[in-house]
Amino acid sequence: MKVAIIGSRNLYVNDLQKFIPSETTEIVSGGAKGIDACAARYAASNNIKLTVFLPEYNRYGRAAPLKRNLKIIEYADLVIAFWDGKSKGTKNVIDNCKKQNIELIIHIKEK
């Protein structure tokens, strides 16, 4: 199962193990700091394939992170969102998952 781990850049989760399904075969990330970095570390330390979608600023300009997020959620089988309750980017992912009926688990974590 391809699991996208997305979230606010100011959040960190040290033990992702309890949030990630055991049938996970691939972690999908946006390559940013915060939750994305936690996801990359988790994948590396657990020998799980990591796929990173980076924003294409040359192609999309300021909209690049939002375009990247759409690619992530379309690619993944499950999206796990860690949200600080404020991040507009994470909220956008949550809203898009709901609109597209993409399987989504939301964890609201304050900084």
PLM regions: where:
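Acidic/glycine-enriched connector segments
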Residues: 2, 7-26, 30-111
